[in-house]
Amino acid sequence: MEYRYKNIYLGETIEEIFSELNNSNTEYKRSTFVLLYRPYENIEVYIYLEFGKVRLMKIFDENFQIDNTLKVGIALTDEIVNRYDLYYDDFEEVYLSKKHKELVVIVDLADNIIGFSFHLELVGDEAFATDRIKNYLECKNLQDIYGSLYWSKTLDANIEKREIYGQLDNYKFTFDIITRDIKSIQNLETGEFVKISLNK
């Protein structure tokens, strides 16, 4: 099964999609550290900045279909449930698939299909905000100190400048939004730059 809507696909990197992002179609969601990209009226694309990839897509386009039997606007029948090995998730109030882990079927109260989600589950260490190094002043990439930055609740992003920001103690960290590599570390008390990347 292909997890794609027009030219956007699940797992696509921010580098591949970045030229399409702008302030009118993309919004930074601080609480989840994602860019919410709306390239078309009936789709939401979630770019997880920690990984730099599309990890969630929500599609509500009335003309969208995965194949001839699974499409928006039709009733969810027993045949479809069995074919895709679907089961109802009471917490999320959607149908998940045992056969296609990335597929979510969204239905209304009458069990008519109103949309789909494609998602990549977080596995292993991805599911937890952790650090890879102890001394955050030695970080080379956002993932090195992501846990500390996440828990500090200081993460921010700027699409126009192509940067991700975070603060620990009195240090401001600036990362490239595409590679997530460190661009600079600034001591906010002195204004001095502790580290500036060669790529800046």
Language model features by range: what are they?
Residues 1, 57-61:
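Acidic/histidine-rich, surface-exposed loop or edge segments in extracytoplasmic proteins
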Residues 2-7, 64-69:
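Short, recurring structural edge motifs at helix starts
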Residues 12-56, 71-200:
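A cross-family detector of function-defining hotspots
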Residues 51, 61-63:
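Short glycine-rich, polar/acidic loop-and-turn segments at beta strand-coil junctions
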